[in-house]
Design a protein with these regions (language model features):
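Structural preference for solvent-exposed beta-strand-turn elements
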Residues: 1-299
């Protein structure tokens, strides 16, 4: 394999897939990124067997082929290269020669034949969303995802689609976040729990104004956008019946500026108990009072 790519485009693609790679792997090949030619592009793929990401970068293909290289080391190298053309050539025994500007490297690679297959599986019914809308929905729910590995079904966000609505739900057993948005066109009812790591990667790569497509099959979540594909194995298990705990009526309601509430919370939480940081809300006509208390430190009111 011999290819020529723009260093900046290659770096951007490498950064997108790099976070999928886990620092510690039981299989050495999973610490690598797969480089493979496809027509006039170079595809970069990384996976941890639960989440996979693939990015296509425009390239001049002198000789087609594939190879895998250490994702961490490759990223460290490319970050330091000048903004110029980057040449990669696979040599004997899976060695890879790299040249960019006046710099040259030779890296030890591993055969692409040992790299796990990353595919979209049976994804077929695609749902189109504005990337910024999806990112905002994720931002408004991911904070409530549980980090307790013993409650596996809560370690992700429940994606639910029904007719003309998409709904995202997350809970850690103490707090719950639910966000809904309307869809442009009706879609078949489907749902799945997308793992926290995949959610974090999606939030990181979407939102620059482009439309994205998502699909949920029996055991896989797939997101695609121009030149980018992300796949994740759905979390097995049953998500709690959150509708039972969402109040149907609200006897007390107050409308307040989000900025003012955020500022008030920051002021009083300085003196809240460290472990759970509780803040007491007291409602009265035309007034919301916030109180925080720590027996070792003191009390705050806003």
């Amino acid at each position: 394999m011999e290819v020529h790519v723009d260093r900046d485009a290659f770096l951007k693609g490498l950064q997108m897939v790099h976070n999928v790679v886990e620092p510690r792997q039981t299989l050495p090949i999973l610490a690598n990124v797969l480089l493979e030619t496809d027509k006039d592009t170079l595809r970069l793929t990384a996976t941890d067997l639960e989440v996979g990401a693939r990015v296509s970068v425009p390239a001049k293909i002198a000789t087609g082929g594939s190879i895998t290289l250490s994702a961490r080391k490759l990223l460290e190298i490319v970050k330091e290269l000048p903004a110029a053309g980057l040449a990669l050539k696979v040599q004997e025994n899976s060695w890879v020669a790299m040249r960019c500007g006046g710099a040259s490297y030779k890296l030890v690679g591993l055969s692409a034949s040992d790299f796990p297959a990353v595919s979209t599986g049976a994804a077929s019914a695609w749902i189109t969303l504005d990337g910024k809308v999806l990112r905002d929905m994720l931002t408004q729910t991911i904070f409530a995802v549980s980090h307790d590995e013993s409650r596996y079904a809560l370690n992700g966000i429940l994606f639910g689609v029904h007719d003309r609505e998409i709904r995202l739900v997350a809970t850690d057993g103490h707090r719950l976040a639910l966000v809904t948005r309307a869809l442009v066109s009706p879609a078949s009812a489907v749902s799945g729990i997308v793992p926290r790591k995949a959610v974090q990667e999606i939030a990181r790569i979407v939102g620059s104004g482009e439309d994205v497509q998502i699909a949920i099959s029996d055991n896989q979540f797939v997101l695609q956008m121009p030149n980018v594909l992300l796949m994740a194995r759905l979390i097995e298990g049953t998500f709690p019946n959150y509708e039972q705990v969402v109040p149907k009526a609200h006897p007390h309601k107050i409308v307040v500026s989000r900025g003012a509430l955020t500022a008030a919370l920051r002021r009083v939480s300085v003196l809240s108990e460290e472990r759970t940081k509780p803040v007491k809300f007291t409602l009265s006509p035309g007034l919301l009072k916030l109180t925080a208390y720590s027996p070792e430190i003191g009390r705050a009111h806003v």
